[in-house]
């Protein structure tokens, strides 16, 4: 969270963690059975403020390792939102191929191009993009990308550091008796907010591709995201599904296995 005390000059960066005190089960929340409330590790009187929704890989990794970060650094290296481009369209009559009067609609899409500088000073040098790992060699080229088939530039780049698995990760998890899982992208689970491999009653299950049995103890997440689209094969809208938003954190307790 990014709270700001009433008399403070800037915002703070505060961790959230499960609360397992004597009053945990009487917190006044309608949490699912067996889950602990997630609270601030520091008691700060103040309301949450806005801040970067997207963090740099380096800041995210440092935060996961328990390092302290300041709001100014995270805000400078992160982003509050992705730029969105709105386009206005007209409906085309199928027989005459002419625009139907009054039939206007808009579409919105992420704008990953170079942003404009203020005061007509040109364009920013850096821009956003999708990072894709491929099993085959891809040459620099132009391609249609996304649901609208936008013309995009495919360019080779160096692998980004920060996603390597630490050699001591397994021993640290075993020593702590649990692990914390953070979603880097939205996820659709068969159990709503619960992955399908977890028992909805006991909140226990075996981690995929392992023999490690865990129990879910707490969850911190934003509102669900709607996922839908247009089915070209059936010529109708796809059924809407609910996805867990990126940034959701799941706390697990180790039960069996190593």
What do these predicted regions represent?
Residues 1-258:
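Conserved active-site/ligand-binding neighborhood in enzyme cores
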